[in-house]
Amino acid sequence: MVLLEEKKIKHLEMIQGVINRMASNSFILKGWTVTLVAGLLALAGSKSEASLFRIACVPIMIFWGLDSYYLLQERLYRSLYVKVCRLSDKDIDFSMSATKAEFGNQKNSFLFCFFSATEFCFYFFLAFSCLALEFAIVK
């Protein structure tokens, strides 16, 4: 009986490791976004190039999409974690398959992740700031 409980705990630890990596990737992407956008804004300000403000929106959109993908993966693995918690000890098979086909609900969709509060507030604020600075510099 103890061995079976250990198997379940190990499986949950494996899933938790993936969830932690997804959260860490999301955090790193946000850092890269701020760094890259700050660099482009500094360059745009020093050269008085209004077009660089719009160019800064391109990496924002790319990183927003990537970050949403990581959030989606994190949510799918959280669903897998809950599923494994509910499994009986004898049914543990160490499956790491967390697909939308199995766990697909509204919360586990790319668009829902893209427009989630954390993603939308962060990336929209950055994009809006870039465009607002462009209009402030142009006038």
Identify the residue ranges that each predicted region occupies.
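Hydrophobic alpha-helical transmembrane segments of multipass integral membrane proteins
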Residues: 32-39, 57, 61-64, 128
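Residue-level recognition of hydrophobic positions within alpha-helical transmembrane segments
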Residues: 12, 63, 69-70, 115, ...
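Inner-leaflet juxtamembrane helices
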Residues: 52-103
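Cytosolic-side membrane-entry/anchor segment at the start of a transmembrane helix
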Residues: 1-39
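Membrane-targeting and insertion segments and their boundary/processing signals
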Residues: 6-13, 43-58
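Juxtamembrane "helix exit" motif at the C-terminal ends of alpha-helical transmembrane segments
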Residues: 37-52, 126-139
